[in-house]
From Swiss-Prot:
Residues 389-479 form the REKLES domain. This is Protein dead ringer homolog. It is found in: Nucleus. Residues 316-325 have a biased composition (Basic residues). PANTHER family: AT-RICH INTERACTIVE DOMAIN-CONTAINING PROTEIN ARID DOMAIN- CONTAINING PROTEIN DEAD RINGER PROTEIN B-CELL REGULATOR OF IGH TRANSCRIPTION BRIGHT (PTHR15348), PROTEIN DEAD RINGER (PTHR15348:SF0). One of its GO terms (cellular component) is nucleus. InterPro entries: ARI3A/B/C, ARID_dom, ARID_dom_sf, REKLES_domain.
Length: 490
């Protein structure tokens, strides 16, 4: 988006420059035509005067004696010579004036830095930019603008457009004066980017900036304007030193050290998109120089770092249910892992995860406890085709456990279905619970697992030597609250 705006701004400036040059060309051609018309009128008037003078002289000559007639001819010839000399002098002055006016845009100095606007009175475009608060510096594309020149044909000054990049307009080249005899004083990078050179008194600043601008010019991407950030000049020297000290641009991007770079440059903390702006400015002005001088990274590594930073920026939060695998369903016959998406207890009698110790998972049927001698293999599918009751029936057929009663199968099926519904909304594993299914606690005789006639389920869970008991109601039933008693530690 920023590059498109810059490109659009450059195109608008190019169009403005072209229109100004075209208007200047039309004005000069109009002035040239007016001068030609004036000269033609003067010549015609002089010819008429000469004709009138000849006719009057002929008339007078007829009346004059022969000796005086020769004297008159000599006087007329002398006057004609004086008139021709005066006319030639006037025409030479006009040609020199037009040539001077048209050659002035060519002999301008190279683009100046912000705040420097001397010699702008010669170029109407630079004067217009400086008068409206703009920078008189021109982009590199203006070096290929049309330059008006003078061509003499039959004593008349005519103007034509020479399209192309002139040698005298190249950056760093000496410019010839109007006479074409002596080259003007060559300008330096320090004169063009004076503000960058005066940011500090570091002795290595001038050496670095000269080397940087010279390298960028040799590689065909000259620096033609001073980078601005937060309404102040961006110190390329300090920016380069800070980034190189941290291992180069790729290292800064990967480790997200732009905040330290911003502080090192004394930029305001409230600036928006500081990391993106500094990265783009560094890539434009300094990264080729870093690769050439330091070789800390390659363009392919830089692109990989940028792509990785973009992917990380699009990564969802850690609490998103799509970033973590769902908790496994009943993977063991004796175990169950319960977990919640944000650390809050599930809708059963499970306390906060921070208070739940890690216990070995164990789940037993409601009629008779199943010993640890018959575990289900770990590779049991998360959503198998057999229900939990069917799995128990299969184990009973093998002789591992006695066949459960119909009522216990219904209770176990209901309990298993309830746990599966809970697992559909769980994300992070929190604790392993020990769910007992015996009819009564071995010590106090309290019922631990019982299916009641109103489709409710009485459960008791032993957690950290604390016995929790409550009544579970089916989802969508008339009662949604949970009655829970906490007994004393066993």
């Amino acid at each position: 988006m920023v590059e498109d705006q810059r490109r659009q701004l450059m195109e608008e400036e190019d169009e403005e420059r072209r229109l100004i040059l075209e208007e200047q060309r039309r004005r000069m051609m109009r002035a040239d035509r007016d001068e030609e018309e004036e000269e033609e009128e003067e010549e015609e008037e002089e010819e008429r005067e000469e004709d009138d003078g000849r006719r009057s002289e002929d008339e007078m000559r007829e009346d004059e004696p022969p000796g005086r007639r020769e004297t008159s001819h000599a006087h007329i010839d002398l006057n004609m010579m004086r008139a021709n000399a005066h006319l030639k002098e006037m025409m030479d002055k006009n040609r020199r004036f037009v040539s001077t006016r048209l050659e002035e845009p060519i002999t301008q100095s190279p683009p100046l830095t912000n705040g420097s606007n001397h010699d702008n009175d010669h170029d109407p475009y630079l004067s217009h930019r400086a008068a409206h608060g703009g920078s008189p510096d021109l982009p590199h594309s203006y070096m290929k603008a049309a330059h008006p020149l003078i061509k003499k044909e039959d004593g008349i000054a005519k103007m034509e457009m020479d399209i192309g990049l002139k040698d005298e307009m190249k950056m760093g080249a000496g410019l010839e004066d109007r006479d074409g005899d002596k080259p003007q004083t060559e300008w330096s990078f320090e004169e063009q980017f004076k503000q960058l050179y005066e940011l500090s008194t570091d002795s290595k600043r001038k050496e670095f900036l000269d080397d940087l601008f010279s390298y960028m010019q040799k590689r065909g991407t000259p620096v033609n304007r001073i980078p601005i950030m937060a309404k102040q000049v961006l110190d390329l020297y300090e920016l380069y030193n800070l980034v190189v000290a941290k291992g180069g641009l790729v290292e800064v991007i990967n480790k997200k050290q732009w905040r330290e770079i911003t502080k090192g440059l004394n930029l305001p903390a409230s600036i928006t998109s500081a990391a993106f702006t500094l990265r783009t400015q560094y890539m434009k002005y300094l990264y080729p120089y870093e690769c050439e001088k330091k070789g800390l990274s390659s363009p392919s590594e830089l692109q990989s770092a940028i792509d990785g930073n973009r992917r990380e920026g699009r990564r969802p939060s850690y609490h998103s249910p799509h970033m973590h695998p769902r908790g496994p369903s009943l993977a063991y016959h004796h175990g169950l892992d319960l977990h919640t998406p944000s650390g809050s207890p599930p809708p059963t009698m499970i306390p906060h995860p921070s208070r739940i110790p890690t216990l070995p998972p164990r789940l037993s049927p409601s009629t008779s406890p199943i010993e640890d001698d018959h575990p289900v293999p770990l590779g049991f599918p998360r959503q198998g085709t057999l229900s939990h009751a069917a799995m128990l029936a299969e184990l009973a057929e093998r002789g591992s456990i006695p066949p459960p009663s119909k009522r216990s199968l219904l209770a176990e099926e209901h309990h298993h279905r309830l746990l599966q519904l809970q697992q559909q909304h769980l994300v992070m594993p929190t604790a392993h619970l020990k769910v007992s299914s015996a009819r009564a606690h071995p010590e106090n005789g309290m019922p631990l697992f019982e299916m009641r006639g109103d489709n409710s389920l009485v459960m008791s869970i032993e957690l950290n030597s604390v016995l929790y008991q409550g009544v579970l109601y089916p989802r969508g039933g008339t009662r949604s609250s949970l009655d829970r008693d906490t007994s004393t530690p066993v």
